[in-house]
């Protein structure tokens, strides 16, 4: 449950944390909090925008399927995605998506943490 998470205990990981509000799947998944590393890798801050508008990765349908698994099936999802960046380097992103619930039943937020590694330029 959301009440079980203390943001102060997550301070070390805040740059890689993203929180998405779930109002209605898939069109009302809204970025509530986006860590500084997530903003840097994306090149802009998607806070307040929908996942459909501002998703990060190579395949929107796969990304939405990850959210569906978390929201509808209440599963933890791990994802690996080698995404080419604007400067020709690959950003290898490892992501974990966790369901959060205010009432212990319905998922109303998704807590995401990701790490990236830059790889050699694409020639």
Stretches with model-predicted labels:
Residues 1-123:
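Sensory/regulatory domains in signal-transduction proteins
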């Amino acid at each position: 449950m959301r009440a079980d998470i203390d943001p102060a205990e997550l301070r070390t990981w805040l740059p890689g944390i993203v929180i998405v509000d779930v109002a209605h799947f898939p069109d009302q998944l809204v970025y509530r909090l986006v860590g500084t590393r997530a903003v840097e890798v994306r090149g802009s801050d998607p806070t307040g925008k929908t996942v459909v508008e501002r998703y990060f990765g190579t395949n929107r349908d796969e990304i939405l399927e990850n959210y569906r698994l978390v929201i509808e099936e209440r599963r933890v999802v791990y994802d690996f995605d080698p995404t080419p960046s604007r400067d020709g380097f690959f950003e290898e992103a490892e992501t974990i998506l966790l369901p959060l619930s205010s009432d212990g039943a319905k998922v109303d937020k998704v807590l995401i943490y990701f790490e990236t590694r830059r790889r050699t330029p694409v020639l």
